[in-house]
Structure formats: structure tokens, C-alpha cells
Swiss-Prot record:
Catalytic reaction annotation: urea + 2 H2O + H(+) = hydrogencarbonate + 2 NH4(+)
Native source species: Synechococcus sp. (strain CC9902)
Name the UniProt record assigns to this protein: Urease subunit beta
Keywords for this protein: Cytoplasm, Hydrolase
Compartment annotation: Cytoplasm
Length: 106
């Protein structure tokens, strides 16, 4: 057996599918501002920067369907479709821009 290395990651062989089986919502997003906007993987998308133009009701309780720790950058004038997935667990959103601060489904 090989010696253990602190912090080493040993993934299963093959490919791993992120967020497998999670429902996906695709929305169109435009940056109507004059500065770039970056949104992280676990940010409550409905509360993203006001310069981003999209259906915020459709984005309620959802986050970007991208690997953890990454982000998407929207340059001024950018238009693109993004995939969102629902928050799991207790489905509570606390902080961010303070628009919910409680249960998502209330």
C-alpha cells in the first residue's frame, strides 16, 4: 500500500458527473452595466448584481450549475444563457444581498 499523503485526493476511476439528476433551469442573462460582473458557483443567482438583466423570479432559490469554487464573468454588453440548479439541504438563503434571509420556499 502506498503511503498516505496529507490532503491528497484519490478520486474514483472514470468521470464524475456534477449535480447528476438535479433539475436544470436555463435562463438568458445580459450585463446592461458598464463594468464586468462575476458570479460565483454558490451565489444565490436571483440576488446577483442589479446590472445583470434576467428573470429573477425564475432564478429564486437557484445557483449556477458550474463546479464549486468557480465563477462566470459577464462583460459589459454580454448576453448568454446559463444553467441554474436549486439549492439543496435546508433551502435557506442567508446573507448575499439580504433579499430573502430565510427559507427560499416561504
Amino acid at each position: 500500500m502506498a503511503p498516505l499523503i496529507p490532503g491528497e485526493l484519490i478520486p474514483e476511476p472514470g468521470e464524475l458527473e456534477l449535480n447528476a439528476g438535479r433539475p436544470v433551469t436555463t435562463i438568458s442573462v445580459a450585463n446592461g452595466g458598464d463594468r464586468p460582473v462575476q458570479v460565483g458557483s454558490h451565489f444565490h443567482f436571483a440576488e446577483a448584481n442589479a446590472a445583470l438583466q434576467f428573470d429573477r423570479d425564475a432564478a429564486r432559490g437557484q445557483r449556477l450549475d458550474i463546479p464549486a469554487g468557480t465563477a462566470i464573468r459577464f462583460e459589459p454588453g454580454d448576453h448568454r444563457d446559463v444553467n441554474l440548479i436549486p439549492f439543496a439541504g435546508h433551502r435557506r438563503v442567508i446573507g448575499f444581498n439580504g433579499r430573502i434571509n430565510g427559507p427560499i420556499d416561504a
